[in-house]
């Protein structure tokens, strides 16, 4: 476990994204912090922007099969990411294309923004190599901000309904539970980065919140 901030912000999930053994991180991060993040998550840091923006956690996501980025990502950015990840990089088309915000994925499935068009669903399925299900969590359509998943569990927005939890469990083939980060913040994805190896969370996250993260995502022996 690592508590962290990016330039004073506890919303670490906005500025970094762990995808299998690759960690995309905003390019102005301190090298020592980047190394600490990578060590905790079992991932190799790649300092990059997506579409020229530092909010790489909001604009990219993926799993062991591929990386999905916003349509705003440049060819150079996509090429660097593809080389580092050694897998396919897909570009999420359409108006709703902040991939990290609108796609919640692990190695078993993807749970996505309910308004994504068919073209986007096809791209997600082909890039990530998993079934894709539309839905929301706690009436939040940007499901990538509302939850964080690994291959053990998915921690969801505290107002997620029982039917939403059941839907995301079926989509990702893992157990779901409710939680918060950063002293009660409901948008889990904005303040938590997780892999199967470890997790990084915003500095303001409390002990009870850490306990729920560890229980849900499988970090308690």
Swiss-Prot record:
The alphabetical list of record keywords is: Initiation factor, Protein biosynthesis
The family database entries (InterPro entries) matched by this protein are listed as: eIF6
Q: Name one GO molecular function term.
A: translation initiation factor activity
Sorted alphabetically, the Gene Ontology BP terms of this entry are: cytosolic ribosome assembly
Which superkingdom is the protein from? Answer: Archaea
Looking up SMART domains in the UniProt record yields: eIF6 (SM00654)
Q: Which family, according to UniProt?
A: Belongs to the eIF-6 family.
What the protein does comes down to:
Binds to the 50S ribosomal subunit and prevents its association with the 30S ribosomal subunit to form the 70S initiation complex.
UniProt protein name: Translation initiation factor 6
UniProt organism field: Halorubrum lacusprofundi (strain ATCC 49239 / DSM 5036 / JCM 8891 / ACAM 34)
Gene for this chain: eif6
